[in-house]
């Protein structure tokens, strides 16, 4: 492409982008779903996960395979 044509096209693109940005900045934007409810949904999900894991860890009797160090004593060797 000729340098003159390149320059003209790049200016057209920049100008159209600037016009779009100017139009968007003058309009009042209504809050989206995420703006309205995002933090409440995030907090609710976090509370649900923490409460579910707390119940699971404390109430349903899972054997967690804790370390036997200090609870298991070795048997004496038998001489044969």
Swiss-Prot record:
Mitochondrial matrix side stretches: 25-39
Range of the transit peptide: 1-24
GO cellular component, one term: mitochondrion
Top-level lineage group: Eukaryota
Ranges annotated as spanning the membrane: 40-60
Topology versus the membrane: Single-pass membrane protein
Mitochondrial intermembrane topological segments: 61-80
One GO-annotated biological process of the protein: mitochondrial electron transport, cytochrome c to oxygen
Cell compartments where the protein resides: Mitochondrion inner membrane
Alphabetic keyword roster: Membrane, Mitochondrion, Mitochondrion inner membrane, Transit peptide, Transmembrane, Transmembrane helix
InterPro entries documented for this protein: Cyt_c_oxidase_suVIIB, Cyt_c_oxidase_suVIIB_dom_sf
Gene3D superfamilies: Cytochrome C Oxidase, chain K
Pathway assigned to this chain's UniProt record: Energy metabolism; oxidative phosphorylation
Function of the molecule: Component of the cytochrome c oxidase, the last enzyme in the mitochondrial electron transport chain which drives oxidative phosphorylation. The respiratory chain contains 3 multisubunit complexes succinate dehydrogenase (complex II, CII), ubiquinol-cytochrome c oxidoreductase (cytochrome b-c1 complex, complex III, CIII) and cytochrome c oxidase (complex IV, CIV), that cooperate to transfer electrons derived from NADH and succinate to molecular oxygen, creating an electrochemical gradient over the inner membrane that drives transmembrane transport and the ATP synthase.
Assembly and interaction partners: Component of the cytochrome c oxidase (complex IV, CIV), a multisubunit enzyme composed of 14 subunits. The complex is composed of a catalytic core of 3 subunits MT-CO1, MT-CO2 and MT-CO3, encoded in the mitochondrial DNA, and 11 supernumerary subunits COX4I, COX5A, COX5B, COX6A, COX6B, COX6C, COX7A, COX7B, COX7C, COX8 and NDUFA4, which are encoded in the nuclear genome.
Similarity remark: Belongs to the cytochrome c oxidase VIIb family.
Protein name: Cytochrome c oxidase subunit 7B, mitochondrial
Highest classification ranks of the organism: Eukaryota, Metazoa, Chordata, Craniata, Vertebrata
Gene name tied to this protein: Cox7b
């Amino acid at each position: 492409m000729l340098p003159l044509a390149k320059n003209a096209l790049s200016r057209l693109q920049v100008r159209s982008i600037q016009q779009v940005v100017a139009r968007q900045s003058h309009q009042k934007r209504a809050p989206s779903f995420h703006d309205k409810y995002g933090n409440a949904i995030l907090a609710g999900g976090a509370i649900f996960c923490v409460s579910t894991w707390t119940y699971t860890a404390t109430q349903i009797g899972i054997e967690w395979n804790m370390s036997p160090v200090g609870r298991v004593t070795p048997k004496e060797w038998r001489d044969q």
